[in-house]
Amino acid sequence: KVANSTARNPRKYAIVTSIILLVMVAFIPTLKATGISTLEGFTKKPKSLIGQELLLQHFPGGQSQPTQILVSKDKSEAVIAAVKGISGVSSIAPEIQDPANPVVKEVNGKIVLDATLKVPADSSAARELIPEIRKAAKSVDNEALVGGISATFHDVDVAARHDRNLIIP
Protein backbone atom coordinates (compact mmCIF):
# COMPACT_ATOMS: atom_id res chain seq x y z
CA LYS A 1 0.00 0.00 0.00
CA VAL A 2 2.74 2.47 1.00
CA ALA A 3 4.90 1.36 -1.92
CA ASN A 4 2.09 1.93 -4.41
CA SER A 5 1.38 5.38 -2.97
CA THR A 6 5.08 6.28 -3.14
CA ALA A 7 5.29 5.06 -6.74
CA ARG A 8 2.29 7.23 -7.72
CA ASN A 9 3.57 10.36 -5.91
CA PRO A 10 7.37 10.18 -5.67
CA ARG A 11 7.86 13.96 -5.69
CA LYS A 12 5.45 14.43 -2.77
CA TYR A 13 7.26 11.79 -0.67
CA ALA A 14 10.66 13.23 -1.54
CA ILE A 15 9.55 16.70 -0.41
CA VAL A 16 7.99 15.43 2.84
CA THR A 17 11.07 13.30 3.60
CA SER A 18 13.37 16.26 2.90
CA ILE A 19 11.37 18.50 5.24
CA ILE A 20 11.51 15.89 8.01
CA LEU A 21 15.27 15.50 7.57
CA LEU A 22 15.80 19.29 7.61
CA VAL A 23 13.84 19.58 10.87
CA MET A 24 15.98 16.82 12.39
CA VAL A 25 19.20 18.46 11.17
CA ALA A 26 18.14 21.73 12.81
CA PHE A 27 18.43 20.04 16.22
CA ILE A 28 21.98 18.68 15.72
CA PRO A 29 23.59 21.59 17.62
CA THR A 30 21.67 20.50 20.73
CA LEU A 31 23.31 17.05 20.65
CA LYS A 32 25.35 16.61 23.82
CA ALA A 33 28.41 14.40 23.40
CA THR A 34 29.16 14.20 27.10
CA GLY A 35 28.92 11.09 29.18
CA ILE A 36 27.44 10.47 32.58
CA SER A 37 29.16 9.40 35.76
CA THR A 38 28.87 5.88 37.07
CA LEU A 39 26.56 7.12 39.82
CA GLU A 40 24.23 8.75 37.28
CA GLY A 41 23.93 5.51 35.31
CA PHE A 42 21.56 3.82 37.75
CA THR A 43 17.77 4.05 37.51
CA LYS A 44 17.34 2.73 41.09
CA LYS A 45 19.52 3.13 44.20
CA PRO A 46 21.40 -0.11 44.91
CA LYS A 47 23.31 -0.45 48.18
CA SER A 48 26.63 0.12 46.40
CA LEU A 49 25.39 3.50 45.17
CA ILE A 50 24.25 4.49 48.66
CA GLY A 51 27.66 3.45 50.03
CA GLN A 52 29.47 5.47 47.36
CA GLU A 53 27.37 8.55 48.14
CA LEU A 54 28.25 8.19 51.85
CA LEU A 55 31.95 7.92 51.01
CA LEU A 56 31.72 11.05 48.87
CA GLN A 57 30.30 12.98 51.84
CA HIS A 58 33.40 12.27 53.92
CA PHE A 59 36.31 11.76 51.51
CA PRO A 60 37.57 13.40 48.31
CA GLY A 61 35.67 12.08 45.30
CA GLY A 62 38.75 11.11 43.33
CA GLN A 63 40.50 9.22 46.12
CA SER A 64 39.79 5.75 44.73
CA GLN A 65 40.91 6.67 41.19
CA PRO A 66 43.56 9.39 41.31
CA THR A 67 44.67 11.31 38.25
CA GLN A 68 48.19 10.19 37.40
CA ILE A 69 50.90 12.54 36.19
CA LEU A 70 54.13 11.15 34.74
CA VAL A 71 56.96 13.65 35.30
CA SER A 72 60.74 13.89 35.46
CA LYS A 73 61.85 13.12 39.01
CA ASP A 74 63.95 16.29 39.19
CA LYS A 75 60.91 18.44 38.32
CA SER A 76 58.40 16.57 40.48
CA GLU A 77 58.39 19.03 43.42
CA ALA A 78 57.69 21.96 41.10
CA VAL A 79 54.90 20.02 39.35
CA ILE A 80 53.40 19.14 42.75
CA ALA A 81 53.41 22.83 43.69
CA ALA A 82 51.83 23.85 40.37
CA VAL A 83 49.07 21.22 40.47
CA LYS A 84 48.37 21.80 44.19
CA GLY A 85 47.31 25.33 43.26
CA ILE A 86 44.34 24.04 41.25
CA SER A 87 41.12 24.43 43.24
CA GLY A 88 39.68 21.03 42.23
CA VAL A 89 42.75 19.10 43.42
CA SER A 90 42.54 17.78 46.99
CA SER A 91 46.10 16.45 47.24
CA ILE A 92 49.06 15.35 45.14
CA ALA A 93 52.02 13.15 46.04
CA PRO A 94 54.39 10.67 44.42
CA GLU A 95 52.82 7.27 43.83
CA ILE A 96 53.89 4.64 46.35
CA GLN A 97 53.31 1.00 45.42
CA ASP A 98 53.60 -0.47 48.92
CA PRO A 99 52.65 1.58 52.01
CA ALA A 100 54.73 -0.81 54.16
CA ASN A 101 57.79 0.10 52.07
CA PRO A 102 57.19 3.73 51.02
CA VAL A 103 59.65 4.00 48.14
CA VAL A 104 58.88 6.07 45.06
CA LYS A 105 59.36 3.96 41.94
CA GLU A 106 61.56 5.65 39.34
CA VAL A 107 61.88 4.45 35.74
CA ASN A 108 64.25 6.20 33.33
CA GLY A 109 64.28 9.32 35.51
CA LYS A 110 60.46 9.54 35.59
CA ILE A 111 58.03 9.08 38.49
CA VAL A 112 54.25 9.01 38.76
CA LEU A 113 52.38 11.56 40.86
CA ASP A 114 48.89 10.73 42.15
CA ALA A 115 46.58 13.75 42.19
CA THR A 116 43.41 13.19 44.21
CA LEU A 117 40.54 15.28 42.89
CA LYS A 118 37.83 16.74 45.13
CA VAL A 119 35.14 15.39 42.80
CA PRO A 120 34.45 11.80 41.67
CA ALA A 121 36.95 10.70 39.03
CA ASP A 122 34.24 9.73 36.54
CA SER A 123 32.26 12.98 36.84
CA SER A 124 32.06 15.73 34.24
CA ALA A 125 33.60 18.10 36.81
CA ALA A 126 36.70 15.86 36.95
CA ARG A 127 36.90 15.79 33.15
CA GLU A 128 36.80 19.59 33.10
CA LEU A 129 39.82 19.74 35.45
CA ILE A 130 42.09 17.75 33.13
CA PRO A 131 43.09 20.60 30.75
CA GLU A 132 44.03 22.77 33.74
CA ILE A 133 46.06 19.95 35.31
CA ARG A 134 47.82 19.31 32.00
CA LYS A 135 48.59 23.00 31.58
CA ALA A 136 49.99 23.29 35.12
CA ALA A 137 52.13 20.15 34.78
CA LYS A 138 53.46 21.09 31.33
CA SER A 139 54.29 24.60 32.50
CA VAL A 140 56.95 22.99 34.69
CA ASP A 141 57.80 19.79 32.79
CA ASN A 142 57.16 20.03 29.06
CA GLU A 143 57.20 16.22 28.80
CA ALA A 144 54.63 15.65 31.58
CA LEU A 145 51.81 13.25 30.74
CA VAL A 146 48.45 13.22 32.52
CA GLY A 147 46.45 10.00 32.68
CA GLY A 148 43.94 8.11 34.75
CA ILE A 149 40.21 7.58 34.38
CA SER A 150 39.33 11.29 34.40
CA ALA A 151 41.87 12.03 31.66
CA THR A 152 40.65 9.07 29.62
CA PHE A 153 37.03 10.24 29.85
CA HIS A 154 38.10 13.80 28.98
CA ASP A 155 39.97 12.62 25.89
CA VAL A 156 37.03 10.43 24.80
CA ASP A 157 34.70 13.45 25.16
CA VAL A 158 37.04 15.63 23.10
CA ALA A 159 37.28 12.97 20.38
CA ALA A 160 33.49 12.46 20.37
CA ARG A 161 32.85 16.20 19.98
CA HIS A 162 35.44 16.42 17.21
CA ASP A 163 33.92 13.46 15.36
CA ARG A 164 30.38 14.77 15.85
CA ASN A 165 31.32 18.16 14.41
CA LEU A 166 33.26 16.61 11.54
CA ILE A 167 31.01 13.72 10.52
CA ILE A 168 27.43 14.83 11.21
CA PRO A 169 27.42 18.07 9.18
Give residue ranges: language-model regions.
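Structured non-transmembrane domains adjacent to transmembrane bundles in polytopic membrane proteins
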Residues: 33-169
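Structured helix-beta-strand junction loops
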Residues: 8-9, 140
